[in-house]
Amino acid sequence: DMKKIILALLTASIIISSCDILDKYPHDAVSRDSVSEEDLELLYTGLYCYSQYKPGFEGYFQNDMTGGDFFRGGGSVWPDAPSWIKDFFLPTNGWIQAPYTGYYALLYQINSFIEVAEKAAQTDKVRQMLGVAYYFRALDYYNIVTKYRIAPLMRVTSNDPQPNSTEEALWAFVNEDLEKALAMCPEYSTKYYVSLQA
């Protein structure tokens, strides 16, 4: 009996003492309050990725479709651009939903970056990254307002539904962010990155 009690106590002490291994920060996530400049650079790289891929193929292709600049080949069931546009541009169609959702997914990432970067030490590098983030947010809203005219204006990260803003308010916000971007963007380094000259 004594051996069973000792074994039970030993097992319990091992289990209890090993619980602190779970109290460590995850290796694949960073608290918003402890983001370093190195972490910001990784998030910054993500902004370039999101800005390119989140609106989706449809987001970039919509302008060509609605402008009548794209025509299908001879084997198409749509004889002309207006027929195709009429069929594809319904509110329930993915050609409308996917870019809209993508623009706001991108906006969520941009706003998250801005909120974290504004709390960081304002080194030249951080200010330049903030300038690029403001540019991306202005570009995102430019795409939203030119395609949808009215949409929710999200200045901060939120998952709560927001009412639509007026077209004038959206354009004013685009201009506000472009002014911030002009004050902070880095000088030209390569054609692949946002710069003051671009």
Model-assigned labels for residue ranges:
Residues L7-T11:
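Sec-dependent N-terminal signal peptides
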Residues D28-A29, L153-P161:
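Short linear capping/connector segments at secondary-structure termini
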Residues C19-Q62, T66:
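Membrane-proximal, proline-rich intrinsically disordered regions
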Residues K191-A198:
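Amphipathic alpha-helical protein-interaction segments enriched in hydrophobic
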Residues E41, S76-Y148, D160-E168, E179-K191:
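Conserved, well-structured interaction surfaces
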Residues M2-I5:
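Positively charged n-region of N-terminal signal peptides that target proteins for export
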